[in-house]
Amino acid sequence: ATTEIYTLSLHDALPILLLLWPLLIVMAILIKIKMPGGPAFFTQKRVGKNGKLFTCHKFRSMTVKHSGSTVSVAGDSRITPLGATLRHYKIDELPGLWDVMIGNMSFVGPRPDVPGYADRLEGDNRIVLKLRPGITGPATLKYRLEDEMISEYVAQKQKEGDIRTAQEIAEEFNDRVIYPDKVRINKYYYEHYSFIKDIQMIFCTVLGKNMKYNNEII
């Protein structure tokens, strides 16, 4: 399964990059204008296939100086107005096509974790590390509005009188609910790989549509 994913990704990434390069250039210029004082691209070490670290590329969506937390919520002060738009429409992920082209990522697969989260994988859960990380995937589709979901949870907890900071509440919800569910979904993806489902996920990502996967709507 992973060989098929890699072949599809490597062969298709270059023509897509060539097709989208004008958009990538425009986005990079827009980021430099609207978010001065920092680079257009955000790079970070992520955990790839077999636990190997690689440099992941995205368009920058946050201010240059922000906390190191990887959990964000809708309306997060670290996210700029332009960055919020890029994230909502997943445009910030387009530079990941470079990572696909050089073989570090696939079009479809689990999102690459930062080392701290990947280190939490134990037992059978570690099989997800056998997969090449993807720009999209079943967990990505299910949690495409993750920032908004976390924001709603934070607002509800604060309404109930929770005195923790918004970031602390967000991280607790992510660690307790969202991350374990993503691992569950990615394990199923590994164990029940389908090339047809991969194609369907790519189309659903581009078109913003939902699909049925493992008896749930993602």
Question: Which residue ranges define each predicted feature?
Answer:
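Short, exposed "boundary/linker" segments that immediately precede the start
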Residues: A1-T7
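Residue-level signal for cytosolic alpha-helical hairpin/rod architecture
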Residues: H11, I79-L82, R184
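Hydrophobic structural segments characteristic of membrane proteins
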Residues: P39, M101-I218
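Cytosolic-biased juxtamembrane loops and peripheral soluble domains of multi-pass membrane proteins
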Residues: T63-T85, V114-L121, E152-Y153
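Short, well-ordered beta-strand elements within core beta-sheets of diverse protein domains
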Residues: L82-Y89, N186-E191
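Periplasmic N-terminal gating module of Gram-negative TonB-dependent outer-membrane receptors
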Residues: K90-L94
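Gly/Thr-rich phosphate-binding loop signature of adenosyl cofactor/nucleotide-binding cores
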Residues: L97
